[in-house]
UniProtKB/Swiss-Prot annotation:
GO terms assigned for molecular function: carbohydrate derivative binding; carbon-oxygen lyase activity; ether hydrolase activity
Gene name as annotated: murQ
Known catalytic reactions: N-acetyl-D-muramate 6-phosphate + H2O = N-acetyl-D-glucosamine 6-phosphate + (R)-lactate
Sorted UniProt keywords: Carbohydrate metabolism, Lyase
Subunit structure: Homodimer.
InterPro entries noted in UniProt: Etherase_MurQ (IPR005488), Glucokinase_regulatory_CS (IPR005486), MURQ/GCKR (IPR040190), SIS_dom (IPR001347), SIS_dom_sf (IPR046348)
HAMAP family: MurQ (MF_00068)
Any one Gene Ontology BP term: peptidoglycan turnover
Protein name as it appears in the record: N-acetylmuramic acid 6-phosphate etherase
Family annotation (PROSITE patterns): GCKR, SIS
Induction (UniProt): Induced by MurNAc 6-phosphate that releases the repressor MurR from the DNA. Repressed by MurR in the absence of MurNAc 6-phosphate.
Family stated for the protein in its record: Belongs to the GCKR-like family. MurNAc-6-P etherase subfamily.
Length: 298
């Protein structure tokens, strides 16, 4: 697909005079365009749901969720991956973010990195990609060689693959087994796909990782019950989570957390089933770490 024919490279009539308006009007134009992004994502919810189910199945079988992208797309993948361990208590290697050009490219532009097909393949080889893994290729344009080659290599290995782009009929969409294509239209600044396209990608990634964690028992109700208390804010959040899940007071919640080495799930089961820490942990282990299953009457 030729670059000039891509929707993400089109000219947006709503912002044609944006360099001549007041600062407030400039903000209104950008905001009005941003409002269209969730609607574009809404139109592809069935595709997102299908991808979540596949990702969950693979991760449940011992696989990993791997994001692959260049520039803004790569950085968004890294951002999503890096938030999973503290939020959901998973090991750092379960959700992986790879970016064309490597770690240096997180903060700097690396010329030619996104055009390297070899780079996409080598980065996946370097993390020991296996058929159990799911590779999610992210590219607003849908034409990034680094991402396309990575998806091709992943499929050759037998991996399940997902392609996220904002141009229908793109190479990324056709290469991946599952395509997620929120069409957000032309950007406020022509071709600046870090804006609406990047926002759409972030919303999709939020759903993929959050959906995976919910289906993996990392959420009880709407509480992040595997959160790791790495700072004072999260320490307080743990107490509030146990309080909200059980109806106990702060002192009881803190006592339960101390008794089980600050594991919210265990503390919740301790309080609700009147068990000690070891008994509660054993009960959770017997039910795959799912609180709801652990609370069901035998």
């Amino acid at each position: 697909m030729q670059l000039e024919k891509m929707i993400t490279e089109g000219s947006n009539a709503a912002s044609a005079e944006i360099d001549r308006v007041s600062t407030l009007e400039m903000c209104r134009i950008i905001n009005d365009e941003d409002k269209t992004v969730p609607l574009a994502v809404e139109r592809v919810l069935p595709d997102i749901a299908a991808a979540i189910d596949v990702i969950h199945a693979q991760v449940s079988g011992g696989g990993r969720l791997i994001y692959l992208g260049a520039g803004t797309s790569g950085r968004l993948g890294i951002l999503d991956a890096s938030e999973c361990p503290p939020t959901y208590g998973v090991k750092p290697g379960l959700v992986v973010g790879l970016i064309a050009g490597g770690e240096y490219a997180i903060q700097h532009a690396v010329e030619g990195a996104e055009d390297s097909r070899e780079g996409g393949v080598n980065d996946l080889k370097n993390i020991g990609l296996t058929a159990q893994d799911v590779v999610v290729g992210i590219a607003a344009s849908g034409r990034t060689p680094y991402v396309i080659a990575g998806l091709e290599y992943a499929r050759q290995l037998g991996c399940r693959t997902v392609g996220i782009s904002c141009n229908p009929g793109s190479a990324v969409s056709s290469t991946a087994e599952f395509a997620i294509t929120p069409v957000v239209g032309a950007e406020v600044v022509t071709g600046s796909s870090r804006m609406k396209a990047g926002t759409a990608q972030k919303l999709v990634l939020n759903m993929l990782s959050t959906g995976l964690m919910i289906k993996s028992g990392k959420v009880f109700g709407n509480l992040m019950v595997d959160v790791v208390a790495t700072n004072e804010k999260l320490h307080v959040r743990q107490v509030n989570i146990v309080k909200n899940a059980t109806g106990c007071n702060a002192e009881q919640a803190e006592a339960a957390l101390i008794a089980c080495e600050r594991n919210c799930k265990t503390a919740i089961v301790m309080v609700l089933k009147n068990l000690d820490a070891d008994e509660a942990k054993k009960c959770l282990d017997q039910h795959g770490g799912f609180i709801r299953k652990a609370l069901e009457k035998e």
